[in-house]
């Protein structure tokens, strides 16, 4: 890989918060034909760092016509398991609430003790960038209208790259969050025909010409 011999590899390969989210997002892409598994991978990535939460509008739009319930079921189930794990491992209620807030990112953007590009720039400039990032995340729910696997990969890479511009800690340094998806986007073949309606594995329901509900074959 292009970062194999870089200082980033030596410093952060063993860091769970650097290496694991990107790996889980790649596995979510690999399992895109199985919405339940893809949702579980995305939910687990969200439990590691909360930034994959901003991928939900894009992924939900991809599965909108088929597979949405299975995708959300996988994501919600995995997040629920992680919350239960937090409850079991926390020493008291206050510690559980604090860890839960950290997991879901329920806090005002940090402006002190930052590490990375924002250590040298005025923190006030982060807020319009953050607002633009949230707008981009929500815009992926409706644009482009029909999403294929290529859209899923490129949109996910763009959003995870976008987090680097406002991430307070090591902002701009978490290459492993977006670089695997970016490489998949660059070297992908034509994926215009890989849409959820035609490639998903698993049963579903549809109506035939007589209006009867039948089970869709896998």
What are these regions (language model features)?
Residues 32-40, 60-72, 186-218:
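Membrane-interface junctions at the ends of membrane-embedded or membrane-associated helices
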Residues 4-36, 63-175, 179, 185-191:
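Primarily membrane-embedded glycan-assembly and transfer machineries that use lipid-linked glycans
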Residues 40-61, 168-173:
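Transmembrane helices and adjacent periplasmic/lumenal helix-loop junctions
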